[in-house]
Amino acid sequence: LLKSLHKDERVIILEDVHEVTVDHVVEAVYMMYGDAGKIGRVSATDALRACMRLTPGRIIMTELRDDAAWDYLKALNTGHPGGVMSTHANSARDAFNRIGLLIKATPIGRMLDMSDIMRMLYSTIDVVVHMEKRKIKEIYFDPEYKMQCVNGSL
């Protein structure tokens, strides 16, 4: 997926451990995050806020977890053409459940109905690639279901 990024896109990469390279992209900004409170570290949420000030074309985030799940979903819904993120899940479809539970655990997520969170996820995320040991195991892509979520026909 990352190799398909156009060389002239503004790409912001948010990582807790450096794993991602996009050498073919001219304007790539790397931001490191970690456990907030440690000297020299900012939280993933702080990194996302800083990222949004840079007018990203694409936002790549590794290890989506904690409160950052809600912030990342909001970032993807602000008119950017897309993003790539990683999280731990048991399958491609289970990634939606995992992210949904992460969002539900946030202060804002606790006020939202889980079905609304899931509808937002399915209407925002186009493709999920499930990998094990750096090999593709499964790909989720269901544009018809996405359109049902977008149109509210579920």
Feature map (PLM): residue ranges:
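Conserved P-loop NTPase
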Residues: R119-L154
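Switch/coupling sub-region of P-loop NTPases
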Residues: K3-Y122
